[in-house]
Amino acid sequence: ISKAFDIPVVSGNVSFYNECAAHRVYPSVTLGMLGFCPDENNLIKARFYENNEIYIIGKKITKESNTGGSLYQSVFFDFISGMPDKYDIELEKRLKKTIFELISQNKITGAKDVSKGGVLGSLLCMAFDSNIGFSAKLLNEKTNNNSQKLKLLFGEIEGRYIIATDEGEYVEKYLQKNNIEYYRAGKCFGDKIEFDGYCFDLVKLRNIYKNSIKNALGE
């Protein structure tokens, strides 16, 4: 992967010692990497702006997709198992090239992968950091079983990204040109989190999220 993307890996660490009888540290490698951005105007954050359109782009959910190793699996079942989704280097290269080009053209204002919490978790993080709500349809009419719904909402699928833009028509044509699958999920506005029949108050959810460690410690 380092060679494919021409990115230097300058350090790495795997810890097997910071654990106790009740909890084990996952044997996941932590990598230190360096990057260079020649123009600070091309730096964007994982956030929304008022009236942004939300797109989910990249790999489609299939029967082979899974929620193995995901935050959803850890929280709801208190264990981690299964295999992560298959990594497609060629797709990732095409996706990143397209996203970087759109950023350099000032056509997208925010972007985030779904590697922590899946699509729903990533959307919530973007909303919390922006203090802007959203209204989205994340499940389509073809989603007819719970397994598929869980994958769409919580699957930490490689090759799936969320992008926010004010120029949806241009972005759609550019994605089509670069053979990138996309789905217009919704729009950013207000102080509510709305998706597929659910509605939550942004401020209340944000406070729960931001104060979770303090609350867990009983402070």
Enumerate the language-model features and the residues they cover.
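Polyanion-binding loop/helix "lid" in catalytic or ligand-binding cores
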Residues: 80-120
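Mobile "lid/hinge" segments at catalytic clefts and subdomain interfaces of large enzymes
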Residues: 25-89, 100-103, 158, 166-167
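Glycine-/charge-enriched secondary-structure boundary and capping motifs
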Residues: 1, 5, 10-29, 104-219
